[in-house]
């Protein structure tokens, strides 16, 4: 595939006629299972009904009521595990393509210049958010709507977190993310980049200047394996960030071996194929029936020509050769490649939050409140799923917990 395809979305968008046609397949369930299955409460049942009746503005309002990153989630959500898994239409033929319908609506919103969000009143005092990833961005919208003056502090040069630095542009175009963030800033949310807690500012400083602080730092650092400590390998998150920042203009090997089977591994493999790598192989210790990658990402990688080997774990490495053993069966497999990339997990840098007593990438909370009652946490660093839509969910719920705490509405 030509290199410029890195900037083109792999999945085509619905036209208005195709969107209405797809929405007309909906059985219009009274108590829609798809809506119950959405972690962010985006309410697909309601916005699909609006599409069916050609009320695209109403559909956009439904999405934005609960999801400030509706256009992002439309593209990156594992819908087959969530809303589409509950679709009643699946019992007839196939589930409604909810993600593409949501993408159609949010694209229509952007193209027609809708302004659903309004500026906040900022009457209830200041709240600081650490991290401009999906949890922090969603929390800022919820808090602004409640009347708070919100400032997000982001360590990178641009906001977005993993959405900007990790997800390939053929899955999430930069223009889509930029539009989401511009919409949030227009509400009155202040985003201060190049501000890292533990470097340019401290948690104590933010506590002194704000009524509450919400920590939403993500799992931005890639993990390695001891076996590969002295090998010439690249960590998956570093590769994805390098490709994204260069808009795909990077040197590509003739062959690549990715170790890992999650969504990040699939993103690495798909990126390599889109950019022209001839032979890309993913080797994962999980077998196919328990594969961690979403079906959408797995299928997309396979369609691009990625080879996937399941049930093998690395046991030895020599130069560009890796030897694997099957997790259940006897026998070994040795593979060589021009480039080896590790996609075996990610971790957060929480040294600056030692007073919150983080343990293994997690800050313990009760109703999102940490051991310090003024400090809350959400996103990847709290227990639960690590998808974007769950980050949106926790960001919204943490914002509501902050509001209840500050207003004395609960004893959380």
UniProtKB/Swiss-Prot annotation:
InterPro entries: DPD_II (IPR028261), FAD/NAD-bd_sf (IPR036188), FAD/NAD-binding_dom (IPR023753), Helical_ferredxn (IPR009051). Keywords: NAD, Oxidoreductase. Its EC number is 1.3.1.1. It is an enzyme of class 1 (oxidoreductase). Gene3D superfamilies: Alpha-helical ferredoxin, FAD/NAD(P)-binding domain. One of its GO terms (cellular component) is oxidoreductase complex. Induction: Transcriptionally regulated by IscS. GO terms for biological process: pyrimidine nucleobase catabolic process; thymine catabolic process; uracil catabolic process. It catalyses: 5,6-dihydrouracil + NAD(+) = uracil + NADH + H(+); 5,6-dihydrothymine + NAD(+) = thymine + NADH + H(+). Involved in pyrimidine base degradation. Catalyzes physiologically the reduction of uracil to 5,6-dihydrouracil (DHU) by using NADH as a specific cosubstrate. It also catalyzes the reverse reaction and the reduction of thymine to 5,6-dihydrothymine (DHT). Belongs to the NADH dehydrogenase family. Heterotetramer of 2 PreA and 2 PreT subunits. This is NAD-dependent dihydropyrimidine dehydrogenase subunit PreT. The gene is preT.
